[in-house]
């Protein structure tokens, strides 16, 4: 049985990158391929790149695709260069975490930034549990908003083609 992490690399770029889309896709695809090339514990499944002005997670086609792949078990590790790529604000970040923590199978999150590094695999200082508690507390306060967000996200997932 393969116990390696199945990695989905995620990048969210501003709309202005549309002009240089091919170069951006090539660069980020190469970055992730190189990052996981010799990692025996992690296998890169796909790189998901959104070039959009949309801040909301459910309006980003590749993020929706990535979350659908997490839900169906194709990906169990979301890797992003920065936390900011994952979510534009605290609300979306907490909703995203809650959605991931609610999945029946474990999905980890790792970011590569020094300032706000997330690594739920290494779990330094019990980071995974702390993030889970943060997400649960936030979504309990904004339960109705979270449920509406989740419904929108899952509706968008039904439109996603398999990669």
Annotated model-derived regions:
Residues 1-148, 152:
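Short, structured surface patches at the beginning of a domain
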Residues 144, 152-163:
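Amphipathic alpha-helical coiled-coil segments
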